[in-house]
Amino acid sequence: SNLLDNPIYGNIVTGIFDVSSKTRAELWGVYSAKYRVLTTMPIAIASSLSTAIVPAMVRSYIAKDKQGMENKVSLALKFSMLIAFPCGMGLSVLGGPINQLLFGDGSKRTATIMIFSLLTVVVFSLSTISNAILQGIDKLNIPIKNSAISLVLHLIILSVLLIVFRLDIYAVVIGDITFGLTV
C-alpha cells in the first residue's frame, strides 16, 4: 500500500489543497523516514515469529493434531502481543522523545503521528501472525484475497480521509492502520 500512498497523497495535497511540494515532502518524510521506520521494528519481530511457526503448524496440520495446532496458534499470538503491545505503547507514549533522540526532531506533529504507533504495531503484528497461520494450514489463497480487498479498502479510505476530512498526513497513517485491520 505504501507504493500507492505516496503518489495519491502527493497528488491530492499538492493538487487539490495547494500545499507546496516542500511541505508535502517534509510531511511524507516524517511518515516514511520516522514513523514507518520505528513501527517496522516490532513488526519485524512478529514477522520472524510467523516464519518460525509455519513448519510447526504444517507438522501439526499434517498429523491432524488439532490440540497441537491450537497450542501453537495461542503461543504465537501471545508471544507476538507480548512484544507488539509494549513496543507499540512505548512508541505511542514516548514517540516525541524517541524522535528527538534518534532524529533530532522534537516537533509536535511528529509526536502526534507517533500516537498511532500502538494501533499500527498491534494490527500489523496480528495480521502477520494470522497470515502465517493460514499458510501453515494450507489456506494460501485467503491471505492473498484479504490483501487485495484490504488494498482496495485502504485506497478508498485514504482518499476519503484526504479529500473529505482533510486529515493530511494523518490520513495516510489511519489508512495504514485500516489496511492492517482488514488484512
Regions found by a protein language model. Name each.
Residues 74, 92-122:
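Interfacial segments at transmembrane-helix termini and the short loops linking adjacent helices
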Residues 43-64:
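Helix-loop junctions and terminal segments of transmembrane helices
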Residues 119-149:
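Membrane-interface junctions at transmembrane-helix termini in multi-pass inner-membrane proteins
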